[in-house]
């Protein structure tokens, strides 16, 4: 596939808006990315991204989730009713520290490159939920209050904090799973957030 001419500055602005120069210490090759396609089909790009690229995004989430000051930004992104397209990720990344922004910038570059030129990736929602339910069982054994936090549905601060804590604990469990399973789980979380992880019901389409 031949890439159309790109507007590198526009894509740079998409990934790195309003960051101080001292924070922009990245060496990312954006020359092969079709900016217009990324902006117009962000959700489709995520669905077509290669497994390795999705796992790179998981690793970026994992590292950021370990930082208390950054975890809440990620948790807001994975709330059941939150938008999780590329623009939403960018708004979240803007709230993170330089190291996490660097990881996400590299991960998104790979997602964009593979998602623009690749075919739709096979995805089994039932298998993804099975991976997440197994991770939830493990997290329940490791962490008191995990399931209570995971299944909370309120919009008050305590409920949101409980879901955030459960999200961080689940991500920590998923890191030890094979890449294939991590990718399945990540694709589900990108589409649905924490919705339906515990109750096992099929997602509405």
Language model features with spans:
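Hydrophobic membrane-targeting signal helices
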Residues: 15-20, 142
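Bacterial N-terminal signal peptides
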Residues: 7-17
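Sequence contexts marking disulfide-bonded cysteines in secreted/extracellular proteins
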Residues: 74-78, 135-136, 163-165
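Extended amphipathic alpha-helical interaction segments
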Residues: 87-156
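Positively charged n-region of N-terminal signal peptides that target proteins for export
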Residues: 1-4
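A cross-kingdom marker for long, charged
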Residues: 155-205
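N-terminal Sec/ER secretory leader and immediately downstream segment
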Residues: 23-111
